[in-house]
Amino acid sequence: MGIIYKMYAGESPSNKFPPMQGYPIWDGPVIDPDPTCNKHYDYPALGPSGIAIYPEYLTDINVLNCPSSARQGGVKMMTPEISAQEPGCLQYEGMIAQPDMSYFYLGFIVDKASMKTISPSDVFQLTVGSKTLEVSNQVASAYFKITAVGDDWKPKPEALDSDLKGPFAYPNSGNGTSDTIYRLREGVERFMITDINNPAASNKAQSEILIMSDLLSNTGADQLFNHIPGGCNVLFMDGHVAFQKYEAQGDIPCNALIANAIGLLAQ
């Protein structure tokens, strides 16, 4: 997937990586763009946008399926069987609907979601639907910028493909010392400076920026890890993959704050 994201970024405006999927194009957060195709995977996904990468960059959807996944089945796709039942879905046949069956991809830089680098005052009790869990203020601020409904996960498509700019619900939610949560893009590591008085020592390299990871969750739809003992294979922006063991107060992404966020948002 690393080379797929790099290829996409090389041809996209501003060298951006693909946005998060959110809703499939026939569904929407408030009103369905196409009411002729209903009740088929009509919920948002925490994976890369299928319409952005398939089939031009991602030629085989099985790349998105982890052999060790604890979820039943693989990536979901609109099929001829669905079109036979509902002809309005014919134009979407072959499109990916649920690219997050094994891995999660957010499309934004998350750099403030580990108790190693934030304080207890930077943690928020986020409620989504009937669930309430602790997430970092940065994740909560991004959530409120993206969702169309405050207490439910209904991401707006336009928000998923843009930088999230302050003011935020919670202060200091931007990446580094900025007032922006950046979309993933080539060169974005330049904005990750945490100490303006010593930028050379406090910036991040692409090898430290999270792109994609195995699903993990403390609750909700995904209570199991893909790999036992608990941990995740993590893809970083420079293309390397590393296995990270789960630690509640560990590094991003294999920690309690990220696991809580995925538990709240994954379906």
Where does each model-flagged region fall?
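Short, well-structured segments within or immediately adjacent to enzyme catalytic domains
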Residues: 2-267
